[in-house]
Amino acid sequence: MGKASRDKRDIYYRKAKEEGWRARSAFKLLQIDEEFNIFEGVKRVVDLCAAPGSWSQVLSRKLYLPAKLSPDSKDSDLPLIVAIDLQPMAPIEGVIQVQGDITNARTAETVIRHFDGGKADLVVCDGAPDVTGLHDMDEFVQSQLILALKLFFTEVTFAKPKSSRNSSIEAFVVCENYSPPEGFNEKDLHRLLEKIGSPSGADDLDCSSGWLEGPNKVYIPFLACGDLNGYDSDRSYPLPKSADGSYQSLDPVQPPIAPPYKRALEMKKASSHGTQGLEKLSLDP
């Protein structure tokens, strides 16, 4: 009953299982592509925070498999897809997996080696930074992210896919036309990280919001993605019934292999069994 209830309440969860996606988030990337056409001309792509792999599935189906099935395709012409996550992920055809930290320079060097020294045409990420719970600090950190993106891309847009619930306070930043500042050197980032990592480095940073006022204040356009006549992620839909009037719920395509919450679930299950054991003992004569 529980599975059928969720299938009814979450149409994208149900459609993901029916279409073979590992998670409903696959539709978010598909709807972003419908609006921005981000896959056009892409030969090298990186998927950050990839597990359990629904976005990597989209990349494989949209980029790798069509090229592989083309009669004129050559191995050297096939798109290269690299997926990165701290957690292990089940294999996906055409996707190179790297288990590592996306903030580590060595991980970036590993990706570039897979690209034979080339740079990525597209980087996608369905991950979010941890929040501190201190709203002023979180807002400052997010403003720093927006500033960094505006410095490196000429077009920055907030996109809200239709498969993203209205009740979910999330949006995706779509950045186009990579154009780094004049004189920018990638090694500058390494020096900056080394400075911030030093005991006194943080003391040199201006964490006030005053510099964001006046001419420095930036407004980012917000755009809804997806067919307005498509499925509504906040609405319940009737379940498709078979000839005998029954409904069979499908299992998830590929559950996470080693999710970070696995230990918590095991402890909860063990605690529940312990409580049931105590209740049984108390009822015995």
Question: Predicted regions span which residues?
Answer:
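Class I SAM-dependent methyltransferase "Motif I" SAM/SAH-binding loop
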Residues: 46-53, 86
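Conserved S-adenosyl-L-methionine
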Residues: 59-80, 153-165
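S-adenosyl-L-methionine
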Residues: 74-80, 84-130
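SAM/dcSAM-binding transferase cores
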Residues: 2-23, 35, 172-285
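Class I SAM-dependent methyltransferase Rossmann-like catalytic core
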Residues: 1-44, 55-61, 65
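Mobile active-site "lid"/loop adjacent to the S-adenosyl-L-methionine
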Residues: 115-148, 152-153
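Residue-level signature of catalytic and energy-coupling elements of molecular machines
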Residues: 29, 49, 97, 123, ...
